[in-house]
Curated annotation (Swiss-Prot):
This is Putative manganese efflux pump MntP. InterPro entries: Mntp/YtaF, Put_MntP. GO terms for molecular function: manganese ion transmembrane transporter activity. It holds the Pfam family Mntp. The chain crosses the membrane at residues 3-23, 37-57, 65-85, 107-129, 144-164, 169-189. Belongs to the MntP (TC 9.B.29) family. It is a multi-pass membrane protein. HAMAP family: MntP_pump.
Amino acid sequence: MSPISILLIGFAMSTDAFAAAIGKGAAMRKPVFRDALRAGIIFGVIEAITPIIGWLLGRAALQYVEAFDHWIAFGLLGALGIHMIYNGLRPDSAEEDEDPSQHHGFWKLALTGFATSIDAMAVGIGLAFMDVHIGVMAVVIGLCTLTMVTVGIMLGRVLGSMVGKRAEIIGGVILVIIGATILYEHLHGVA
């Protein structure tokens, strides 16, 4: 997998967390960089671990599905991408009126981080069928997420109403394109 594809997957995996961070930043009275960085680290670590878990699950099943692994990667990335696009296009439900101080709790951040990283676990399953170093991919996904969450919280006040959903749509489109590229390359023998 090319370095550009690895970076694009890292970016795509961080868009859910970025959208959540914008929402958290928008709910805070005045986000402080230290709190934003702390949230970024929590999200980044979780987002880096989940594709490794998915990769391990995928490797365990590899011998049984090698003949159609490209279809699995395409299906997982495509389905996740379409789901992200759908979530980005659907109208928001009623906004919760939460106490902004609750956005800083470790367990609340960790739970949100895990919820936004489920797609990274599924991508990890797909990566098990490809020639990619999972350690490098996990670090890239974690660093992209750390950066996107930190920036998202700090910009949340300003960007909350403008960017939140678009980030998820862009991430979804990227996943669909990468999935289609994997399928195309396999079917046409492109290395």
